[in-house]
A protein has these predicted regions:
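C-terminal regulatory/interaction regions
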Residues: 1-4, 13, 279-281, 307-327
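Conserved beta-strand hairpin/beta-sheet module of binuclear metal-dependent hydrolase folds
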Residues: 2-64, 215-240
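Flexible, acidic/histidine-containing loops and adjacent segments that form or flank the divalent-metal
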Residues: 2-4, 61-68, 80-241, 317-327
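Active-site environment of divalent metal-dependent phosphoester hydrolases
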Residues: 13-15, 74-80, 118-122, 241-245, ...
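Active-site metal-binding motif and surrounding structural segment of the metallo-beta-lactamase
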Residues: 27, 38-112, 254-272, 299
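Short, flexible/disordered intra-domain loops and linkers
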Residues: 35-46, 122-134, 272-282, 307-316
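Short amphipathic alpha-helices and their capping/turn segments at secondary-structure boundaries
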Residues: 247-257, 287-290
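A short, acidic, amphipathic alpha-helical segment used as a generic capping/interface helix at domain edges
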Residues: 279-292
Length: 327
């Protein structure tokens, strides 16, 4: 059995993170597929080419297969290109992909992770890619609401991150819903023993601050390696600002759920993890969260190169992608 590998793709300020678990299952957290990076005369890293050529080697229905796609929140730098790169709006069990769709290598998503709150509160302020994601989530939810016989097939599965009292979720079975404070090990229709997901947010009630960013999915992923349980503790938080991280610490009684040895800097290493304004002193709660590091922890910034200033030191160099292997 191979080790779990995490690839942070360089998409400037944005997120595209691929987790390849030790059992062969894969998960993509957010996407930013920049069309200009696909041009032959462009030196930017061609993310979609790497995914299709080197990563998504399993096929279903003649399409590259991704076990799970997680959208932390629907800002454009987290879902750019979604509408163009994935097989959407069709039930693959009923409508076979066309030859054109196969030649275009549209990606079939086994299970979609969807947090409905931000979509319902900001429906008029969504990009075309975010609307496309919402439309696909609605299609899958309708299969579960009507108890369609194909609802739990690859390409139709959905995981709701939120609460069942939202109107849109009427009729969705509890098995498809995971709320803040809950842990799951089921992914793409199967229970897994080598890794597990603890959901920290979004919360049921809104908190003060940027209402889009405070609804980001924040989760801890714990993965085993060989005989070591929870050898890797990964935390992803989209664009969650400091108030979210403060409340997470207040609500989490099991402090092991706050531990990390790999932490993606929220909001592309923005000051909003520490304070409302870059001139403000960092909030103590944010500094306390960083103390949850276990061992030789690493923080990854999904951003443009951070230039030297009074807060940061640039360790420099042009990178193709960052890959971390948990052993």
């Amino acid at each position: 059995m191979s080790n779990t590998k995490i690839t942070f793709y360089p998409v400037k300020n944005g997120d595209t993170n691929l987790i390849e678990f030790s059992d062969g299952v894969n998960m993509l957290i957010d996407c930013k597929f920049r069309s200009e990076a696909e041009a032959e005369d462009n030196d930017d890293y061609n993310v979609i080419n790497d995914l299709l050529t080197n990563k998504l080697t399993t096929k279903k229905k003649g399409l590259p297969y991704l076990n799970a796609f997680v959208l932390t929140h629907p800002d454009q730098d987290h879902c750019l290109g979604f509408a163009q790169k994935f097989f959407l709006e069709k039930n693959p069990e009923i409508t076979e992909p066309t030859e054109e769709e196969k030649e275009s290598k549209l990606i079939l998503i086994g299970e979609l992770w969807y947090s409905p709150r931000v979509f319902t509160e900001h429906e008029d302020d969504l990009s075309d890619d975010a609307k496309s994601f919402k439309k696909e989530a609605d299609r899958r939810m309708q299969l579960w609401k009507t108890n369609d016989s194909t609802k739990d097939k690859p390409g139709n599965r959905i995981r709701i991150i939120g609460y069942s009292d939202v109107d849109d979720l009427n009729g969705i079975p509890d098995e498809c819903i995971t709320a803040a404070g809950e842990e799951i090990s089921k992914l793409d229709g199967k229970n897994h023993t080598q890794y597990r997901f603890f959901i920290h947010s979004p919360f049921k009630k809104a908190i003060e601050g940027d209402s889009r960013n405070e609804t980001s999915i924040v989760m801890q992923i714990r993965v085993d390696a060989d005989s070591s349980k929870d050898a890797g503790k990964l935390i992803f938080g989209g664009d969650a600002e400091w108030r979210v991280w403060k409340k997470i610490q207040e609500k989490t009684s099991d402090k092991k759920k706050l531990e990390w040895n790999l932490f993606e800097a929220p909001h592309h290493c923005s000051y909003t993890f520490f304070a409302d304004d870059r001139e403000n002193d960092p909030e103590e709660s944010s500094l306390n969260f960083l103390d949850n590091r276990v061992g030789n922890g690493y923080i990854v910034s999904s951003s443009k190169t951070i230039k030297k200033n009074r807060f940061f030191v640039n360790f420099g160099g042009n990178i193709s992608s960052i890959s971390v292997c948990i052993k």
